[in-house]
A protein has these predicted regions:
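Catalytic cores of nucleotide-sugar-dependent glycosyltransferases that transfer UDP/GDP/TDP-activated
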Residues: 2-600
Length: 600
């Protein structure tokens, strides 16, 4: 039974405390291992894990179940159990004046030191939304956002009523626009009780969502229309109601509202924060914003040993010294391994789409007839990622290096027309291109160990974890000069032999193709050297970027140096432990700002 008079910390004690953050509630629409559609899920899982294991914080991740609590394998691996004494119930009032009842609960589990709370439906009307397995669907997404906000708000009230206020967070970290209602709601509920719990909002990707105040209000998501001390610029603080902030200040922008209410705003790269987020939101985040990089903890040695054991054992006896080289892995991947993708049932991806390109009658992906330099691309199938630009570049690259292969692992979206168009375009190059929808885990990793160059032709890229996955496995990146790519990839044209790839202007297919040809040739020359062969065919003449042509003239093994640069850059700067330390610094500032706000 709830405690009659729950004992809460006094305002005075909360204002004066200087203790560091120790308990964090993460709010996210997705999380790797449970329900993931893209880099957001990877970021939330990686940051939560390092904060829990390396920084020893008590971290809890809250997200809609998306029906994952019904999966026996997930229940077992996360130890999920229903919270028997917690129920979130009530009604939401629609713009039509009708009541919509909801009845929600939560499943709790843990993994790698992190607690996970999955909001689920306890009746058919609520389960229809919270347990919908499609992570992103227009109507369902907004329903999940609202119901999750209601559920976590009720959970905070539940802990207080049960005399368990010590389980409440020291800090709330909301990830992306989907979690603005939940983050603001819990912050508001705790502030009403004198608890200065800071809200950190990370903008992973701007969406420009515009909604009426009714959506966020107490009628629907649950945010009360009470006065709030809002800092509208660096020096000025105004007291406005939440509806005024939403409508008059933020012009019904969900993301602007979140940034205004948050005590601290972060994004995943400094470039994206300053050039995109700040431009969109305005000066209000000056003095309360900073970036937190994403990370990658892949261990190439472990990956290689496990992949070789699983995928490569059959041809090991044919190797001279028993140890496969990169070109051995590549030949095996292109001429044998990719045929396994449809035969085996490991493919994973949204909606389990498996309509890969060049399929054989038995449903498997058709292998290439020969080996060749390999360009790899991975990521979501969306206009943002520029898959169409890479497909445009194929004939240009092929004219210079006819044997080049392009392998694209793409996570499909709900845009069936885009999927169909992409597959049709790839089929025009049967000797050069394969598109694989979803991920076959072992083949996906093998492709990183086997590739020569990684392509990242994004039109916009807040960070781009895939660039880290490429570089840690020794793949130089040809990427567009946008967002986080400019901070992860060191341009060979500008930094010489210390570079990790080439940056090209966005939407410039000619430059993209030219850079791919130049970097592929550098890697081919290095491979010839490792094999003890000479450049009798004069392929070095294909290097079209003159600064790199001069570097290769001095060092024919430049490719090996670039691969080493790639691995070192990720290992030294972009591990999740690095991201965790950045987050702790941002949390400290957010806590100080929240305490100052409460004192006003």
């Amino acid at each position: 039974m709830p405690a009659a008079n729950p004992k809460l910390p006094s305002k005075a004690s909360l204002r004066s405390t200087g203790r560091p953050v120790s308990k964090v509630w993460m709010f996210s629409h997705e999380c790797a291992g449970l329900a993931q559609a893209g880099g957001l899920g990877e970021a939330v899982a990686g940051l939560s894990k390092t904060l829990a294991l390396d920084s020893k914080l008590d971290v809890s991740v809250f997200l809609p179940s998306h029906g994952r609590h019904l999966d026996p394998s997930i229940r077992e691996s996360y130890g999920l159990q229903g919270l028997a004494t917690f129920i979130a119930q009530g009604h939401r009032t629609g713009v039509n004046g009708l009541w919509y009842n909801y009845l929600a609960g939560m499943e709790k589990g843990s993994r790698d030191g992190v607690n996970y709370f999955l909001a689920k439906g306890l009746d058919s009307a609520t389960s229809k939304w919270l347990d919908d397995p499609v992570i992103y669907d227009h109507e369902a997404t907004f329903e999940k956002m609202s119901l999750l906000a209601r559920t976590v708000g009720s959970y905070a009230d539940y802990l207080i009523s049960m005399g368990r206020a010590r389980e409440l967070p020291d800090l709330i970290h909301a990830h992306d626009w989907h979690m603005v209602p939940a983050g603001v709601l819990v912050k508001q509920r705790l502030a009403e009780r004198g608890m200065a719990v800071p809200l950190v909002l990370t903008v992973h990707l701007l969406s420009g969502v515009i909604l009426p105040w009714h959506y966020a209000s107490e009628e629907w998501c649950g945010i009360r229309d009470i006065p709030y001390s809002l800092r509208t610029n660096v020096k000025r603080v105004s007291t406005l109601k939440f509806s005024q902030i939403w409508q008059d200040v933020c012009r019904n922008s969900l993301e602007k509202f979140g940034c205004y209410i948050a005590d601290y705003v972060t994004s995943v790269s400094n470039t994206y924060l300053r050039n995109d987020v700040s431009t969109y939101v305005g000066n209000t985040i000056r003095g309360k914003s900073g970036h937190i990089y994403n990370g990658c903890d892949w261990n190439p040695a472990i990956i290689e040993s496990s992949i070789v054991a699983v995928e490569f054992e059959k041809i090991r006896p044919g190797l001279i010294d028993g140890a496969p080289k990169r070109w051995d892995l590549r030949e095996y991947l292109l001429t044998k391994a990719i045929s396994k993708i449809e035969k085996e049932s490991e493919i994973k991806g949204p909606a389990r789409l498996r309509d890969g390109s060049r399929k054989k009658e038995d449903g498997s992906i058709e292998t290439f007839r020969s080996d060749g330099p390999l360009v790899l691309m991975t990521g979501r199938l969306s206009p943002q990622k520029g898959v169409d630009l890479l497909l445009d570049a194929i004939p240009l690259v092929r004219s210079a290096i006819p044997e080049t292969k392009f392998l694209l692992f793409l996570l499909p979206s709900n845009d069936s027309d885009l999927t169909k168009t992409t597959l049709e375009r790839a089929r025009k190059y049967p000797d050069n291109a394969r598109v694989i929808l979803g991920r076959h885990p072992s083949i996906y990793l093998l492709s990183h160990l086997a590739a020569d160059v990684y392509a990242m032709p994004s039109r916009s890229e807040p960070f781009g974890i895939s660039a880290l996955e490429a570089m840690i496995t020794g793949n130089p990146v040809v990427g567009t000069s946008v967002g986080g790519i400019t901070e992860t990839v060191v341009d060979l044209s500008a930094k010489g032999e210390s570079g990790t790839g080439i940056l090209v202007p966005p939407e410039n297919v000619a430059k993209l193709a030219q850079s791919l040809v130049s970097l592929l040739t550098i890697m081919q020359l290095d491979e010839l050297g490792q094999r003890g062969k000479r450049d009798d065919a004069g392929i070095s003449r294909k290097i079209l970027v003159q600064s790199m042509a001069r570097m290769v003239a001095k060092n024919r093994n430049l490719g090996s140096k670039i691969r080493e640069n790639c691995r070192n850059r990720v290992a030294e700067k972009f591990r999740w432990t690095n991201a965790g330390q950045m987050a702790l610094n941002r949390y400290s500032v957010a806590r100080s700002l929240a305490l100052k706000t409460l004192q006003k």
